[in-house]
């Protein structure tokens, strides 16, 4: 990947990523870059419910719903460069991909041992798109789902599966 060529990640192999032995971090909280840290008091998340964290989003995680997104990255409507759908009323600016690339490039590489890594699979997705010359969802649809006759399997369910009434994740008390 061109954005990794001048980093400590330039020699990571596909095998290392697939085996989760690349040294990449398990995850990177990219979403933090899209949130306006001045829009809420205290911390965004808490281990317990309190006046600032009334919304439970995990077994032991409570959230402050009063935050705002940075308008340079998030829009409530699809318009211009805001083309990446997050949910029915949130659209991400295409420029956020640069933020993701920068965060991956900056993330310190650790010892090459087994650590499950979402970051590796984000990189693999980017690599597939680069090599195929098309978005991941189009590639998967053409090369996997259609040839196998899979009608209820897909990538980016808001674009395809929800149109046929298969949206198990529609309840969103936090977003």
Q: Language-model segments: which ranges?
A:
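Short, surface-exposed loop or secondary-structure junction motifs
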Residues: 7-175
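Acidic catalytic motifs of isoprenoid enzymes
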Residues: 4
């Amino acid at each position: 990947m061109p954005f990794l060529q001048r980093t400590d990640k330039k020699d990571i192999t596909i095998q290392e990523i697939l085996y989760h032995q690349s040294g990449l971090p398990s995850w990177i909280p990219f979403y933090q870059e899209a949130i306006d840290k001045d829009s809420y008091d205290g911390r965004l998340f808490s281990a317990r419910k309190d006046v600032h964290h009334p919304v439970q989003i995990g077994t032991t995680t409570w959230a402050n719903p009063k935050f705002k997104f940075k308008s340079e990255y998030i829009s409530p409507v699809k318009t211009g460069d805001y083309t990446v759908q997050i949910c029915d009323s949130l659209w991400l600016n295409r420029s956020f991909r640069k933020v993701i690339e920068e965060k991956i490039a900056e993330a310190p590489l650790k010892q090459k041992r087994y650590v499950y890594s979402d970051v590796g699979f984000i990189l693999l997705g980017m690599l597939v798109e680069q090599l195929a010359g098309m978005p991941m969802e189009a590639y998967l649809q053409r090369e996997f789902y259609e040839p196998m006759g899979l009608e209820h399997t897909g990538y980016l369910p808001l674009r395809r599966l929800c149109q046929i009434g298969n949206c198990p994740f529609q309840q969103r008390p936090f977003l």
